[in-house]
Amino acid sequence: MKAWVICLMVISIFMMIEPTLAAGGGKFLNPGVLDPCLRPNPPPECQAPGSAGKPRERVNEYKVGCSKLTRCDRVG
């Protein structure tokens, strides 16, 4: 009796799986999902989209030094 129940369960499982295998084979991850440059907060070595081949530009020239206002006093 137990053998018939197990056999019936195996046959029913194969009948449920067959339409999904025939329809599309299965679902696969897009390779872009695993790319760390496409995730939020990419690492520094990743380039922004559309910036390939362009030279890097200096964004902010920060000059460390004293001014008349702060008199070389650093608060920190």
Curated annotation (Swiss-Prot):
One Pfam family in the UniProt entry: RALF
Disulphide bridges, residue numbers: 37-46, 66-72
Entry keyword set: Disulfide bond, Hormone, Secreted, Signal
Localization in the cell: Secreted
GO CC annotation: apoplast
Gene Ontology MF terms in the entry: hormone activity
Chief localization: secreted
Any Gene Ontology biological process: regulation of growth
Recorded superkingdom: Eukaryota
Signal peptide: 1-22
Free-text function comment from the UniProt entry: Cell signaling peptide that may regulate plant stress, growth, and development. Mediates a rapid alkalinization of extracellular space by mediating a transient increase in the cytoplasmic Ca(2+) concentration leading to a calcium-dependent signaling events through a cell surface receptor and a concomitant activation of some intracellular mitogen-activated protein kinases.
Family: Belongs to the plant rapid alkalinization factor (RALF) family.
Full protein name: Protein RALF-like 30
Organism: Arabidopsis thaliana (Mouse-ear cress)
The encoding gene: RALFL30
